[in-house]
Design a protein with these regions (language model features):
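Ligand-binding "clamshell"
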Residues: 1-8
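Residue-level detector of short coil/turn "hinge" positions at structural boundaries
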Residues: 4, 109-110
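Residue-level detector of family-conserved "landmark" positions at structurally sensitive sites
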Residues: 7, 89, 112-113
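A structural motif
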Residues: 8-15
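A bilobed periplasmic-binding-protein/Venus flytrap-type ligand-binding module shared by bacterial periplasmic
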Residues: 16-32
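Secondary-structure end/capping motifs
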Residues: 27-109
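Hinge/cleft segment of the Venus flytrap/periplasmic-binding protein
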Residues: 110-123
Length: 123
């Protein structure tokens, strides 16, 4: 268990949290998805402009089982490790690293290229 987490953390930037839709869905809902992208960028800017205590206070209602000092320490560790991106842009290196990991781990049968999968909104 612990070794797997260490190995995953040591491989470098990897794209995990993204929003997925079909090309048709993007065509039908492009304006709404662009608005979502703008909202996420504003949230990312706020996260990076405030300290861990501010973020812990804001998110505490979602983590009622955690003591405030534990939540603060976890958020501080995430910040220190650069877990939260400063952009909504899906990085090719991170995408390729995740695709390789999913393929080598047997989660997908073939790798699909970055260009075939990713749409980054112009900022």
């Amino acid at each position: 268990g612990g070794r797997l987490l260490y190995d995953a953390a040591s491989r470098g930037p990897t794209v995990y949290t993204t929003f997925i839709c079909s090309r048709d869905g993007l065509a039908r809902n492009g304006a709404a998805l662009a608005a979502l992208d703008r909202a996420l960028r504003a949230t990312q800017a706020w996260i990076h402009a405030h300290d861990a205590r501010d973020l812990a206070r804001l998110t505490a209602p979602f983590f009622t089982e955690l003591a405030p000092d534990i939540l603060h320490a976890a958020i501080e560790r995430y910040r220190r490790n650069g877990i939260w991106s400063e952009t909504t842009h899906v990085n090719k290196e991170g995408f390729d690293r995740l695709a390789c990991s999913l393929h080598s781990g047997g989660f997908v049968s073939s790798r699909i290229g970055y260009e075939a999968c990713v749409h980054n909104f112009d900022h």
